[in-house]
Amino acid sequence: MIIMNTKKMLFIVVISIITIQSYSQNSNEFRIYYGFSDSELIRDVSLVGAGSQYAENSKEFGIKYLKQLKNNLSIELGINFLKSDLILNGAPMIPAFPTTYEKLEMISIPIYANYTLWKYLFVNGGPILDFQITENSIDSQSGIGYSIGFGGKYDFNNFLIYINPNYKRHAVLPFEKENYHQRLTEFGLQFGLGYKF
C-alpha cells in the first residue's frame, strides 16, 4: 500500500515537473534592443518671449523580460537607457544668453502589457518610471510617464527578431513639478533580438 502510494506520488511529481518545465519554456522571454527617436520638449502652454529648447539625436538601448500571463498576454518589464542632445536657445530679447548644448541621460523602467495578435504582430504599452541622471537646464524628466506601441516579430527556434515603433511621453507625473513643466515626447523605433526559455 505504501509502495503504491509512493509510486503514485512519484508519478504525479514527475508529470508536474514536466508540465511546469514545458510551460516555463513557452512563458519566459528575454530581449535586448537598440532604438532611436524623434524627440521634442513640449509644454502644455506656449510661453511668449521665453527661450527655446530642443532634443535631438535621441538614442536608447535596453533589456526586457516578458512573462506570459495568458495565451496572448504577457507582462513586459525592463530597464532602458536614453541619451539625447539638448540645444538651449536663450530668450530672443536677451542676447547675453547664447545658445548652449547639453547631454540628457535617463534611465527608465517600463512596466508594460504586451498582447500578441495572430503570430507575427503585437501591441504593448503602459507606465514608465523615469530617473534623469544628468543635471540639465530643462525641467526634470524624472517621474512617471507612459508609452504605447505596436510591432512585428519573427520566431526561429527559441530566438526571435522584432521591430517596435512606439510613442513615449515622460514626466506626465513629475517627481519635481515646475510651472508649465516641459515633457520629453518621443516617436521612436526599436530593433531587438529575443530568446525564449
How would you label these PLM feature ranges?
Residues 26-28, 55-61, 103-107, 140-146, ...:
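Residues that define the transmembrane beta-barrel architecture of outer-membrane proteins
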Residues 29-33, 74-78, 122-124, 160-164, ...:
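Residue-level detector of the transmembrane beta-barrel scaffold of outer-membrane proteins
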Residues 23-78, 168:
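Short glycine/proline- and aromatic-enriched beta-strand/turn motifs that initiate or cap beta-hairpins
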Residues 61-67, 79-81, 109-115, 125-129, ...:
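Residues on the lipid-exposed face of transmembrane beta-strands in outer-membrane beta-barrel proteins
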Residues 25, 68-72, 118-120, 155-159, ...:
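Outer-membrane beta-barrel channels and translocator barrels
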Residues 29-31, 154-157, 183-197:
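Outer-membrane beta-barrel "beta-signal"
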Residues 1-31, 197:
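Bacterial Sec-dependent N-terminal signal peptides
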